[in-house]
Amino acid sequence: MKDLLKFLKQQSKTEEFEGIKIGLASPDLIRSWSFGEVKKPETINYRTFKPEREGLFCARIFGPVKDYECLCGKYKRLKHRGVICEKCGVEVTQTKVRRERMGHIDLASPVAHIWFLKSLPSRIGLMLDMTLRDIERVLYFESFVVIEPGMTSLERGQMLTEENYLDALEEYGDEFEAKMGAEAVLELLRAIDLEKEIEEMREELPSINSETRRKKITKRLKLIEAFYQSGNKPEWMILKVLPVLPPDLRPLVPLDGGRFATSDLNDLYRRVINRNNRLKRLLDLAAPDIIVRNEKRMLQESVDALLDNGRRGRAITGSNKRPLKSLADMIKGKQGRFRQNLLGKRVDYSGRSVITVGPTLRLHQCGLPKKMALELFKPFIYGKLEGRGLATTIKAAKKMVEREVPEVWDVLDDVIREHPVMLNRAPTLHRLGIQAFEPVLIEGKAIQLHPLVCAAYNADFDGDQMAVHVPLTLEAQLEARSLMMSTNNILSPANGEPVITPSQDVVLGLYYTSRERINGRGEGMAFESVAEVEKAYRTGVAELHARVKVRITETTIAEDGERTESRRIVDTTVGRALLSQVLPKGLSYDLVNQNMGKKQISKLLNTCYRQLGLKDTVIFADQLMYTGFHFATVSGASVGINDMVIPDEKYSLVADAEAEVLEIQEQFQSGLVTAGERYNKVIDIWASANEKVSKAMMDNLSTETVINRDGEEETQASFNSIYMMADSGARGSAAQIRQLAGMRGLMAKPDGSIIETPITANFREGLNVLQYFISTHGARKGLADTALKTANSGYLTRRLVDVAQDLVVIEDDCGTHEGLTMKPLIEGGDVVEPLRERVLGRVVAEDVYYPGTEDVLAPRNTLLDEAWCDKLEEHSIDEVKVRSVISCDTDFGVCAACYGRDLARGHLINQGEAIGVVAAQSIGEPGTQLTMRTFHIGGAASRASAENNVQVKNAGTVKLHNAKHVTNSDGKLVIVSRSSEIAIIDELGREKERYKVPYGTVLEKLEDATVNAGEVIANRDPHTHPIVSEVAGSIKFVDMIEGVTMTRQTDELTGLSSIVVMDVGQRPTAGKEMRPAIRLVGADGNDLMIPGTEVPAQYFLPGKAIVNQDDNAQIAVGDALARIPQESSKTRDITGGLPRVADLFEARKPKEPAILAEYSGTISFGKETKGKRRLVITPADGGKPYEEMIPKWRNLNVFEGEKVERGEVIADGPEAAHDILRLRGIHKVANYIVNEVQDVYRLQGVKINDKHIEVIIRQMLRKCEITEAGDSEFLPGEQVEVSRVKIANRELEAQGKEPAKFERELLGITKASLATESFISAASFQETTRVLTEAAVGGKSDKLRGLKENVIVGRLIPAGTGYAYHTSRNQAAQNGPAEEVPAISASEAEQNLADLLNLAGSPE
């Protein structure tokens, strides 16, 4: 018996390996793998079902069909192990070897491997420097190629058609050699001397001027170097020997009725063998050339189909007209080996069932049906039954369990105790989609789920199903309990807020409990303690909502954990006093002494977690839930039709709107307004009518008038059920109530345009047929959108996970001083995100000082928690430089200090945390909530955009940011710079609002003036763009010739005449080269200079400019010299929602991006060409001027002679991330992407921490382009990982050599995933063929650094609990082999394990 065990053990040991290398297999290597040549296309004998000899399933080559039994039956049983039968030639061994042993086919003629031929760029083509078309013509026998030119005028690699070849033969005889087919290509490849080629090309590179040629040579050089360094030989891209897959991996299964189900590969192999055998025979017979050629071509095609069916020509189809699945199809795509079998596997010890509510469970429990538990824990039960002596053998135990003897249930109870199970609901969008619970046995067949974890699972009880998994080993149970238990996952990893907040019924119950009612029964009573309140409530003396006075006891916990009690009397209600009973000690009573809506409850739980920690919060959350359910039941809140009160004013409001619409209609018919204006106005009228109706309705619903104790009328918040549900945040919203009791309002057509006749009815009144029909559009669109959205969002998540999967925290501090400067986010007049929310949980990068002093408030490397943020707010700090993963210096990972707080745990992140995957999940999970559509800005919205003044919302002082300005004759400031901003600062120096002010805005207030809320501080004309004079003087026209460069126009109404500059296209030839301008001269007739510069005050006028001054007129500073009419900006569709997020992460270029200045300098315009303007920037330091052609229709923001800074906007438009990175640097591009992504999510009310987006951006920025190679081995223009360049540069600097210079590159997430160092990870993501081809040619080796690679090879991942295992392995690898581990006998191991299990199961 012992021998048997020993024998079984030794087969499963795999050798340790550091990485996986992929390369090309030489013919000799293929032969060395093989156990014999497959010569016949036969598979198995259909009568005996025995494999045919030398066929595709031959037992002699691949091994026996039955365990330890040769084919003819001469040798059976274990004792003949390893004998080779002399009759049938089969080795007696396990049948498992049929999964491992390969065969081979010797090809009669070499065949090109289709991956290296057709996978773009064609590797064979690059190697030979020939085009793919030419090579294909050679391979498929359409033309000859010269192999040895000899002494002739032909060139090596030259193509010859059949005729040319015959001519050449006549001319030169056998001086030269030309061939066709794969043999020819093979000889060409064999003749390449890699070393010589590399030397020649490296010498040639510096002298090449043409960009395309340099690119081509660099590509070829890279390929040849890859071959040279990896030891691959180019001729191995042509196959001489074809390996045959082991037969059990391409099985043939007999079905009943004498038919067979077979893997497609068998068909493909059969074709290859048939053609190969036929070709051999033809060659032996010395058949005519044309027949042999045809057969060779067919062989090439059948091998192509076997390797990658459908890559060339039409795919070979089987009997049922579908393409056969080739070897390449086996590994790629969702059903391929990578994604189906290696990255996701099915597991045993799992069950699934429908879920129902378990309102009586505790947070760490779930209800598990008895039947399910019995099945899942069977092995444990057998073991326990045997151990207790209730069953003698496993078989007996099995019988007992099948009969469900009473003892079995006792044993099951025992087994289940403290044994967590994992519950999972598909789709698992983030890590909270699998959590561990302790099972509680229940009758019935449905799993019971705790209501508070529904939010994390996104589960509801309308038929959702969930799966149960049992962690078997001790380690797995330990991990499930300590990391995955629902009680340990209270905070969301996406934003650090509680994810187990009550919703729906619970919220309604708590809200109802905490409301107050005027003149309730028992109002005005005073109680000595909360217990007394409860007594009064239970006996019916005081009702739940009565306003009373109560003396309460509060506990405060100091920093050192010391508790102090204090008593005070508070004005409160009976309900709130009852709520305070479940409030944990240490929280202030004020937290429940208010109307408890959903937001308040969430804040309450958050406060509880931060102040009292995990355990108290869990208990408190459960208590809140029980209380909420109880009082929601007591309240009797329900939805009745009478609760939907329709306001009386509705009908008059609708009538008024109809009258207004009629008026507009009349104006339109008499031609006063255009069709477009009429449409927009009608929509505006109805939109505002709808607003008024819904306001009237909400006012009506939300208050009621009651008689108070003094007999007077008083209004209070209403107890209307529907209003309470909406107000508490339990269910429904004002918009939904509006449709029930107000009016449904305007509807959209399927194309997104708004129908101008609104639905004036509501659901209580009911809709007529037309109204109902209009409504169906929206409902259908919603359903279609949802389906699309789910797929798109899932794909985005997959790309994000793939790009970030290998990012892990690997050290505590990288020591960098870099970071991002955080300020509060302000848009227009609102603080969208205060500073505290942006820096909470981050680490300070540079000391923060007390304002105006040199004293340090928060030293560098402080982790900013809630207390620190309060301090920053106290001292009104409004910018902090914090560490960020984008600027982290760690190679192949990030450090804990740059990441900051682990949001799901609330402390500094641990080493080994897989932050990349968490970030991807946090961004991808809310993806399904984002909208899919692009917004058409039409009707009401488009006119709002043309504001003509800036009105402030808060009092404060005015501050200008990068604004140049002049003072006009009225003493007001006029802005004469482009990207100026005006901000309002409060008395503490905090910024409250910020507005962009364009060129030509007139400021009503000077800088540092104080303003009151509601004041207008700036005015401008939104429809024209002025040119403002910066000096006072008299006007001189330059190149202004009537009829040539300008025309005079007189306004009919006012009689004023103005000069209009003509567009270049409209001018006669004489005016084409002229450049009309206005020059300002002083009283002495000399040119005036722009103040502070040597530039003459000369303003060039673009086409269509309107000049209202005459020649020689006097002008003051700040006056408008000319106006350029702005055509109302085209209403651009705003891409919103999911597509916008995807565009940002894919770093796609917008259609018409903003044009940014490439250098700092002075603007001038050069010679114009057809349709384009030439913009010239002359650098201030006198460098070479930079020119750029810009289409004429782009609205430029700059004038001649103006100074611009590098990266400033020259022409408006959406900014391209690549430009921002190039011109403004890495921090600006990070800021831009973070803000843009956050805008989309914020619109949907989804909170995601900036950190997660930064993690993805770090991965998008991980490549760089080498600009100067220095003394490194990189090539200029090569794309390399930044970490690798940094490491190489450190070594070079240490040796005193020249380091390489590089520029960071921004890659979209798909590009970045495919460009990762690990080819296994890239291949399992997308474009498997291309990735593997590239890796094989380069002989790449995968160091298995990331998570995916390790999952695929079946190891622990280098993150989380597997992190320690990997660190110790890496250290062991560096320190050399470890000493032998002392062996341990089976009995000892069993004893140790029993002790361990005993420990775990003991009540202590």
UniProtKB/Swiss-Prot annotation:
GO terms for molecular function: DNA binding; DNA-directed RNA polymerase activity; magnesium ion binding; zinc ion binding. Mg(2+) binds at residues 460, 462, 464. It catalyses: RNA(n) + a ribonucleoside 5'-triphosphate = RNA(n+1) + diphosphate. Pfam families: RNA_pol_Rpb1_1, RNA_pol_Rpb1_2, RNA_pol_Rpb1_3, RNA_pol_Rpb1_4, RNA_pol_Rpb1_5. GO terms for cellular component: DNA-directed RNA polymerase complex. Its EC number is 2.7.7.6. Zn(2+) 1 binds at residues 70, 72, 85, 88. Binds 1 Mg(2+) ion per subunit. Binds 2 Zn(2+) ions per subunit. Keywords: DNA-directed RNA polymerase, Magnesium, Metal-binding, Nucleotidyltransferase, Transcription, Transferase, Zinc. Its cofactor is Mg(2+); Zn(2+). It is an enzyme of class 2 (transferase). SUPFAM superfamilies: beta and beta-prime subunits of DNA dependent RNA-polymerase. Zn(2+) 2 binds at residues 814, 888, 895, 898. GO terms for biological process: DNA-templated transcription. Belongs to the RNA polymerase beta' chain family. NCBIfam families: rpoC_TIGR. The RNAP catalytic core consists of 2 alpha, 1 beta, 1 beta' and 1 omega subunit. When a sigma factor is associated with the core the holoenzyme is formed, which can initiate transcription. DNA-dependent RNA polymerase catalyzes the transcription of DNA into RNA using the four ribonucleoside triphosphates as substrates. This is DNA-directed RNA polymerase subunit beta'. The gene is rpoC.
